Structure formats: C-alpha cells, structure tokens
Curated annotation (Swiss-Prot):
This is Multivesicular body sorting factor 12. The keyword Manganese does not apply. Keywords: Acetylation, Cytoplasm, Endosome, Membrane, Phosphoprotein, Protein transport, Transport. GO terms for cellular component: cytosol; endosome; ESCRT I complex; late endosome membrane. Component of the ESCRT-I complex (endosomal sorting complex required for transport I) which consists of STP22, VPS28, SRN2 and MVB12 in a 1:1:1:1 stoichiometry. Interacts with STP22 and SRN2. The modification N-acetylmethionine is found at residue 1. Component of the ESCRT-I complex, a regulator of vesicular trafficking process. Binds to ubiquitinated cargo proteins and is required for the sorting of endocytic ubiquitinated cargos into multivesicular bodies (MVBs). Appears to be involved in cargo sorting and release of the ESCRT-I complex from the MVBs. GO terms for molecular function: ubiquitin binding. It is a peripheral membrane protein. It comes from Saccharomyces cerevisiae (strain ATCC 204508 / S288c). Gene3D superfamilies: 6.10.250.1830.
Length: 101
C-alpha cells in the first residue's frame, strides 16, 4: 500500500508556485498594517457595573419577598380577623347541646 502512494507521488510533476526563477528572485515582503489593542481598563472599573447589577437584583428580590409579607398582613387584617376562631385556628368546632330543662 505504501509503495503505491510513493509511485503515485513520483508521477506528479513538481513545480514551484513562485515560478522557475524563484531561488534567484527575491519575493516581495508582505506589509501588514500595524494594529494596536486598546489599553486595558482597571479591574475595578470593569467589575463595577456587575456589582451594581447584582445589588439591584438583590434589592428587587428583597422587595418581592416583602410584598408577600405585606399581603399576608393585609389578608390577616381584612379577612381572617372577621372569621370565627375555630376556622382560623384549625380547631374542631362541635355543636353544643341545648339543655331543655
């Protein structure tokens, strides 16, 4: 198998992509434009917006949690305070017997 590959490669004519006069000629040097990277910002300046965003998210979460507490307080004052104690306190309400004496 290896011999077949070598024979196949030997049949392919070799050529120089720079032309037949390449070793004597000098190839023109490619001029690449110079580019500059922007200066790096200090880490504190880069992370400051992230810290602010995390603080805002924390505040929104606390506000959401406190709104549930406000609703629970309102529900107790407006609805549960008007119900009989047996319904609110999960105690068994049993009817009392009338004494016909």
């Amino acid at each position: 198998m290896n011999n077949n590959v070598e024979e196949l490669l030997r049949r392919i004519p070799l050529y120089n992509k720079y032309g037949k006069d390449f070793p004597q000629e000098t190839v023109t040097r490619f001029q690449m434009p110079e580019f500059k990277l922007p200066a790096l910002q200090p880490t504190r300046d880069l992370l400051c917006p992230w810290y602010e965003e995390c603080d805002n998210i924390t505040k929104v979460c606390q506000l959401h949690d406190s709104s549930n507490k406000k609703f629970d307080q309102w529900y107790k004052e407006q609805y549960l305070s008007k119900k009989p104690p047996g319904i609110v306190g999960n105690t068994l309400l049993s009817p009392s017997r009338k004494d016909n004496s």
